[in-house]
C-alpha cells in the first residue's frame, strides 16, 4: 500500500523542487496560477519492486526503477483563478507501483459474444500515424501497464513490445486515446517524464502527439500557459524569460478601474456672435502656472 503525506506547497522542500525540475517556480510566477501543490510520496522499497517484477514476469527498466526508488508515484496539481473562482487545470500523474497494473479486458466486455480488445487488432495500422513503428497489441504479443489515466482522456502506458517475459530494453511509452488508437510518445520513461513536466500537465497535452491534435478548448489554455516543449534548459532559467503569446496579466486584471478626469475644452464666449475659430496659443510668450497666455 502506498504511503502518502498531505499536499505540500511546491517550493516547500528542496528535493521536491529537484523532482519537478524547477518548473514550480515558473508556475508560481505565472499570472492567475494558484494552489501549486505536490502530494509527497515515500520511496518504494526494493522488495516491492522485486515483487512487482515477479508477479508480472517483467523486468522493470532502470529509469523506472530509479524513479520509484526516489518516490512511489508522482502527483502534482495546479489551478487558475478566474473571477474569484478557482478552476483545477494542470495535473501531472505517475501511478505508484500498486497502481502500475496491466491493461487487460474490461469487465464491461465480459458478457457472452461481446467484442474483446483482441477484436480491435488489424494489419492495416489504421489510425496509427507511426507507420515505421510496430504498435502495441492487446493480446499476448505485448505487455501493457498503465502509468496515467489522463483524467479519462486516454491512457499513458509502459509497453513491453515482445510480451512476457518482459525485458527492460524492450520497453516504450505509448498513448492510447479514447478511440483505442495507439500513438508513440518516447523510447524511455525518463524522456516521457520530461515531456510531462515541460507540458505543465495541461489538459489533453498528450494529444499534441497525435495526428488530430488537441481540442480547441485545450488550445486556449496552451496559448495562455505555453508549454516549455523541446527546451528543458528553460526550466532552470529565471521566470522573467518565460513569455506567452497572450498577456495573462491583462486577462486576470482587476475590474476596479481608476477613473481619470477628462480635461475640459476651452469655454466658448458668452456672446452669441460667430467668429473665427480659436487661434493657436502663442509659443514665444511666457505663460502662467495654469497654462493660460499672459496678455499685455
Swiss-Prot record:
Keywords: Cytoplasm, Cytoskeleton, Microtubule
Taxonomic lineage of the native organism: Eukaryota, Metazoa, Chordata, Craniata, Vertebrata
Organism: Mus musculus
Name the UniProt record assigns to this protein: Tubulin polyglutamylase complex subunit 2
Subcellular location: Cytoplasm, Cytoskeleton; Cytoplasm, Cytoskeleton, Microtubule organizing center, Centrosome, Centriolar satellite
Record-level GO cellular component terms: centriolar satellite; cytosol; microtubule
Biased composition (Low complexity): 285-296
Positions of region (Disordered): 254-296
Keyword Cytoplasm: yes
Keyword Cytoplasm set for record: yes
Function recorded in the entry: Subunit of the tubulin polyglutamylase complex (TPGC). The complex mediates cilia and flagella polyglutamylation which is essential for their biogenesis and motility.
SUPFAM superfamilies assigned: SMI1/KNR4-like
Record's compositionally biased regions (Basic residues): 254-265
